[in-house]
Curated annotation (Swiss-Prot):
Gene that specifies this protein: yqgF
Organism: Sodalis glossinidius (strain morsitans)
InterPro entries: RNaseH-like_sf, YqgF, YqgF/RNaseH-like_dom, YqgF/RNaseH-like_dom_sf
Family indicated by similarity: Belongs to the YqgF nuclease family.
EC number(s) per entry: 3.1.-.-
Protein name (Swiss-Prot/TrEMBL): Putative pre-16S rRNA nuclease
Compartments (UniProt record): Cytoplasm
């Protein structure tokens, strides 16, 4: 399933982690999945499976910041997640500002499907899409 120039994104949360895949060529992304985390501990086997299947050249992890750009309590956990992903799997991992990605994902899902579309997994995977598309716009090459 891997294609040259594929990029994977993660929207890290303490209960759920959204995942998206995208392409540099088209600068587009689509949701892949969301999976549960236990108090911020991800299912590393699930991540390994996704990385082996898609073989992304880069992994983008959304970095939660306050609106003024300062860090929040979750920021350190996201940095730890990104560092562990790099250490475990040897993939290139970059952090990207994710401010308002969940708000934007919820609004888009609601617009397309009302309240029924606002399932947690869909919101998290949708947030990963927004994070990835934002990163692709900022770093197209």
């Amino acid at each position: 399933m891997a294609a040259a120039g594929s990029i994977m994104a993660f929207d890290f949360g303490t209960r759920s982690i959204g995942v998206a895949i995208g392409q540099r060529v088209t600068c587009t992304a689509r949701p892949l999945t969301a999976f549960k985390a236990r108090d911020g501990v991800p299912d590393w086997q699930q991540i390994e499976k996704l990385l082996k299947e898609w073989r992304p050249e880069t992994v983008v992890v959304g970095l939660p910041l306050n609106m003024d750009g300062s860090e929040q309590p979750l920021t350190a956990r996201v940095r730890k997640f990104a560092n562990r992903m790099h250490g475990r799997f040897g993939v290139q991992v970059v952090l990207h500002d994710e401010r308002l990605s969940t708000v934007e994902a919820r609004a888009g899902l609601f617009e397309r499907g009302g309240y029924r579309a606002l399932e947690k997994g869909k919101v998290d995977a949708g947030s990963a899409v927004i994070i990835l598309e934002s990163w692709l716009e900022q770093f197209p090459e």
